[in-house]
């Protein structure tokens, strides 16, 4: 009798455990679907990130030193985000006089110009731009970048496109397409990022489209983005070195 009761309790326990596991598994799946839905649908995921970068930059303007510059650069942690700091770095080095930012500019340009299909003219102009800075020509990292540029081979069949890791799948697709030279994706990305401070990060993609793919409208975008940034942040006249960068695309 006791044996039968124990067997019955054991079977009941196993059934309940199985049901519980199924419920938990189903609930977990629902949670995952909910999370995936939020990541795909929430429109301000990217803009909140950009807004944070903008706040860091405002702090840098008030306190133009290495500490606040590095705090801003820490927001550009991932490799695909690295070169998007290009405009911030141009201003930090040229307008705010932060020397360490000059190497960062060189690194941003290095990420794009290391692609083997870059035009010879653009490569020469960029080398000339980098060599204006003693900190780039004397610094170990700067020397490595310049050597990379000078040894760059021209082979249009070996395009290297960085992996994009953005939270927004739509933004990810458009950025990847722009890096591959898709005019359609570039236009959509430009429209998507033109409303608020997100436009700052378009400079890298405008630069890629103008420099690597010789897309004429992107050349105008480079100049427009820089002018808008200086105007909206009350930075005054564009400095000589940043103007030299813009002159590459006139």
Regions found by a protein language model. Give the residues of each.
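Alpha-helical repeat scaffolds
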Residues: 85-90, 119-134, 167-173, 202-206, ...
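Short coil/turn linking the two alpha-helices of tandem helical-hairpin repeats
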Residues: 75-83, 106-120, 151-158, 190-197, ...
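Sec-dependent N-terminal signal peptides
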Residues: 5-13
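C-terminal motif of bacterial Sec signal peptides marking the signal peptidase cleavage site
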Residues: 16-18
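Short helix-capping/linker turns of helical repeat alpha-solenoids
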Residues: 60-69, 94-104, 112, 135-144, ...
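N-terminal alpha-helical interaction modules that lie
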Residues: 25-83, 89, 147-190
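Bacterial signal peptide processing site
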Residues: 20-22
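Terminal, low-structured helical/coil segments at or just beyond the last alpha-helical repeat
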Residues: 141-163, 237-250
């Amino acid at each position: 009798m006791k044996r039968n009761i124990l067997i019955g309790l054991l079977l009941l326990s196993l059934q309940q455990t199985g049901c519980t596991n199924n419920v938990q598994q189903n609930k977990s799946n629902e949670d995952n679907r909910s999370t995936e839905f939020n990541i795909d649908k929430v429109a301000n995921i990217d803009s909140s990130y950009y807004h944070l970068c903008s706040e860091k930059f405002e702090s840098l303007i008030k306190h133009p030193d290495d500490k606040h510059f590095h705090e801003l650069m820490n927001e550009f942690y991932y490799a695909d985000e690295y070169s998007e700091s290009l405009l911030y770095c141009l201003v930090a080095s040229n307008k705010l006089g932060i020397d360490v930012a000059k190497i960062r500019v060189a690194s941003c340009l290095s990420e794009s110009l290391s692609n083997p299909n870059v035009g010879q003219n653009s490569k020469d102009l960029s080398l000339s731009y980098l060599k204006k800075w003693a900190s780039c020509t004397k610094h170990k990292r700067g020397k490595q970048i310049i050597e990379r540029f000078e040894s760059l081979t021209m082979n249009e069949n070996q395009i290297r496109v960085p992996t994009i890791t953005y939270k927004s799948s739509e933004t990810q697709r458009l950025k990847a397409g722009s890096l591959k030279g898709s005019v359609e994706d570039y236009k959509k990305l430009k429209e998507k990022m033109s409303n608020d401070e997100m436009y700052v990060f378009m400079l890298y993609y405008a630069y890629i489209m103008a420099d690597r793919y010789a897309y004429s409208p992107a050349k105008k975008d480079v100049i427009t983005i820089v002018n808008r940034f200086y105007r909206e942040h009350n930075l005054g006249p564009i400095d000589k070195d940043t103007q030299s960068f813009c002159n590459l695309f006139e």
